[in-house]
Every structure is written in structure tokens, then in C-alpha cells.
Amino acid sequence: MAKEFSLAVSFGFIEKDCGSFFSSQMTLDPGGRIIDLYRRVSPGWKEPFAGKEYREGSGFHTFPFLGKKIAVGLCGDLWYEENIALLNELDPDVVWWPVYTDYTDSEWNEKAKLEYAEQAGKIHAPVLYVNSVCLDSSGDSEIAKGGAALFEKGSIKEELPAGKEGTLIVEC
């Protein structure tokens, strides 16, 4: 799809590699080539009973994208102070923060987003946050309701509220 439409794409998935499973994020350039594969480093993504084949990645890194130095932190990765310090050492221009959270629209839009903005403010770069959205279960309270934001210096610079369909276009 990236190549067909000449469009860069970044997406999360459960990766299987050599008998191990990882919570991963892959980024493709407009030509459809893999330009990054990041594996979540924090342990919170798996069920407590998961076996040793469910693993975390080995660390953070950056990759070039559209003239910027990009780093990725998946879901819970940015809630560990040691991870914040490691990301800041990399000195990225932008950090992508894709997550899966199941806050209600009002929980996210009224309170939780402020906590995320504060946490993102510990990173010395703008943070692009995006939550998954589940369109097939509108009555289910325990599913991702979407939402996206540009966090910078502890503030919300731009946002697409949870529960709203749309596109958030930002420059950073």
C-alpha cells in the first residue's frame, strides 16, 4: 500500500521472530521499504502468564525520516523514567508515541490527556501521540477510542479528541 500510493506508513503489530514474540512498530517509506522496526522495551504489554517467548526489545534508537531524527516509544515505554533518560540521550527531533488505551472519551478528553502531556513533557522533543481506534465495537467501554495529539514541553499543542473521527495534521 505504501508503494502503491507513494505514502509512508507506520503501524503496530505483534511480531514473531525466531520463536519469540514482540510488540513492534514498523515504518515504511513512500517506496514501501522498511526504514524502521522498533520493539517495545517495557514489560506491560503482555499478560502476566505469558511465557518466556514473549519478549521486550533491546533498546531505543533513532532513524531518519523527512529530514528529521525520529525515535519511537510504544505505549508504556514512556512511563519509565529510565526510558525517558535514554530517549533524551538520543536527542531526537521528534518522538512517536503510538499507544492502545481504553479510556472513555470523557476520561481522556477531560483528564488523562493532561497526564500524558505532562509525561511527554519530560522528553526534550515534540511527542506525536496516537491511540488506536476500534470502530467495530462502539458500545464496548473497554476498547480504544482513538485520539491523537502533539505534546510539547508538557502542553497539548494540537489534538484530535478521543471519540472523534478525523485527521490531525501538525508540523514539528
Which functions belong to the PLM regions below?
Residues M1-S10, W79-T167:
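CN hydrolase (nitrilase-like) catalytic-core segments centered on the catalytic cysteine
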Residues F13, L74, N131:
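A cross-domain feature marking catalytic cores of carbohydrate-active enzymes
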Residues K16-L90, T104-L114, E118, E171-C172:
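Active-site catalytic loop in hydrolytic enzyme cores
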